[in-house]
Amino acid sequence: MRKIITALAFVFVAISANAETFEERAAPCLACHGEKGQSETENTPSLGAQQAPYALIQLFMFREKLRVFEPMNEMAKPLTDDDLRTFSDFIAKLPKPAPSADAGDPARMARAQALAQQHRCNSCHNPDFSGKENVPRIANQREDYLAKTLGEYKDNSRHGYDGSMADVMGPVTAEQIADLAYFIARVR
């Protein structure tokens, strides 16, 4: 899988250098992150309706290798500051990801909702988990990506702008991370 993503990164760089329209430049992004902003690629986030300021910062961090994930670092490398703004605005205008058709197990959903309230997820990410400004939209994000990301915050292998996510995730167990990911992926 990693080889495929790396190959796509090189294709993106080649296409971007020769692309004439923005749609042509965005096509490789949508190949992994979903044509309509809803990813079907394992452990790859859906970008639809993501907050533009958040997307801008993430793209900048990838370009500057402040956030390291090689395919994204390679793809962001040739982007100018204007390109970063254009891409982040484009991402924000994609349709928001649809909730899973599976509404989820009611007991597990209630348990995870209580956990989300206990850890004040709704304070930063909004009560509907739509995000705001430089706080990401997490509502209806891919469950596998949510679990992976929350686990990375817990073990400090992923860093945010400050230590708040690591602080929040510190006491959360692996089982609770799975429940939170399950809930947020299905929130209505």
Spans of model-derived segments:
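Sequence/structural segment immediately N-terminal to covalent heme-attachment motifs in c-type
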Residues: 18-36, 99-127, 142
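C-terminal capping alpha-helices of c-type cytochrome domains
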Residues: 77-99, 144, 170-188
